[in-house]
Amino acid sequence: MTQVTSRQRLSPRVRGLLGGVAAIGLLAGAAGPALADETCQSPYMAKITGEEDYVYVWTLGVEGMGDGSDKLVTVDVRKGSPTFGKAIKSVSVGGRHEAHHGGFTDDRRQFWAAGLSDSKIFIFDVASDPAAPKLVKTIDDFVEKSGGAAGPHGAYALPGRMLIPSLSNKSKTGQAALVEYSNDGTYIATHWLPTDKDPKGAKIEKTADGYGYDARILPRKNVMLTSSFTGLENYMRPFGEMAKDAEAMKKFGQTMVLWDFHARQPKQVLHVPGVPLEVRWAWGPHNNYAFTSTALTSKIWLVYEDEGGAWKAKEVADIGEPGKGMIPVDISLSADDKTLFVDTFMDGTTRVYDVSDPHKPKQILEKKIGAQLNMVSQSWDGKRLYYTSSVLSNWDKTGADNEQFLKAYAWDGKELAPRFEIDFSAEKLGRPHMMAFGAAALYTQ
């Protein structure tokens, strides 16, 4: 398959071929080239192998700040541009919906962005003018269509479809599901996570709590891996209030689920205590493993296939000083599978690990980014890193520590060198959360 760079054109015919090849890979479990720009994006998307032109930032609105609405902010990151490092466009969606995660469709023509509080999904056209996305559709019946799933957590590209993990259900507990839509926004199916009462045929290692969070796929092994967080009754509460509620703190995920992806069938429920969040599969053709981090126990975990073909999970490293409650949040694995970036919210720090031996991570750098820290996005070539600050509107810090920023760095394998930063509060934009990359050349005819 010819890889499309940011200097090349992606014609309708080529887009069709890419979609067709991806579909074949989906059905056959074939291993094709890694297809993504940020290394955590879906393998079913064409990747940017040159430099990204724009960073799209899905941003939480703040009452009394600008228009107060959630918005998609476009940041210019083109070298030599007169607006380099500046927010050049923002598209408000009207109101606050707890903007959180999102993702591109497989043809990269749309960006789907989800709201955790009211379960709305906003669909942006990023192809017509990549510098100025347009809101073209809103899905406002997610709970009804899905049969009761709530809290859509981003969107993950499948060939012609979007996979949307939920965090909750209509009763606001942690019972979660995976929901599929077609690229035109038509509901297709709901797949509920296994529980102790309804294991759905899965082998349970210790418990099946039914919580959901992330979902990531390793196509060549026909494996999907999901992680677990908490329900709406917890994630919309003020963090300090919730942390003092002993019963609330029991309502967090302790599991990861391995699925037969083609069949959408849960096969094995792994015990991963401490709230495993982001899932990052290795990219190498023989690297059958994924990393996650646990928010409440500050550990790096490895989910791997052993020599006998069995899937297992084990903790492989501490994050920061044990017992300090760093709260690991986002992670990013480099395209060569050698470097893992781990962000911790409470101390605003990113830690970089050599994971050449995935069973024995070694920390090689620790750098404070800000008073608080959440997301990290990495360019495919591993040379540029972007960081944002907000976790959830009711969980972010207050006062002087409530820094809201996008910060960009260059990475040479040893140090992170600042490139630019944007103060989202000073710009009256809001709380920046999830990032995604764009390149104008993808859509040039």
Predicted regions and their residues:
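Asp-box/WD-like beta-propeller blade repeats and closely related beta-sheet repeat scaffolds
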Residues: 126-219
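Blade-loop segments of beta-propeller domains
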Residues: 84-154
